[in-house]
Amino acid sequence: MAVLTDDQVDAALPELGGWERADGVLRRSVKFPAFLDGIEAVRRVAERAEAKDHHPDIDIRWRTVTFVLVTHSEGGITEKDLQMAREIDEILDR
């Protein structure tokens, strides 16, 4: 799968809730009402990522969870990352 250009990624960002392109990755941070709410969201994202075999980097800091997407095997952001960002949005926006 081909690495997307910055322009291609930037064109997709408006449809992605709260994602940004920074340092060659897609990143979204979400603050949850409680620590366990964030953990539950991580569990649901992990299930979807496992099913898709495309795993985000996930950082948990108390109530704030940060998801980072990049296709390491391709060395950049690909359509797989955009699709996983959409799926994470779907999970988080329920």
Curated annotation (Swiss-Prot):
Cite the EC number: 4.2.1.96
Lineage top rank: taxon: Bacteria
Catalysed transformations (reactions): (4aS,6R)-4a-hydroxy-L-erythro-5,6,7,8-tetrahydrobiopterin = (6R)-L-erythro-6,7-dihydrobiopterin + H2O
Extract one GO molecular function annotation from the record.
4-alpha-hydroxytetrahydrobiopterin dehydratase activity
- CDD domains in the cross-refs: PCD_DCoH
Specify the signal sequence span. Answer: none
Q: What keywords are annotated for this sequence in UniProt?
A: Lyase
Query: Which InterPro entries does the annotation name?
Result: PCD_sf, Pterin_deHydtase
GO biological process terms, semicolon-separated: tetrahydrobiopterin biosynthetic process
Return the similarity comment. Answer: Belongs to the pterin-4-alpha-carbinolamine dehydratase family.
The UniProt entry, under HAMAP family, shows: Pterin_4_alpha
Q: What is this protein called?
A: Putative pterin-4-alpha-carbinolamine dehydratase
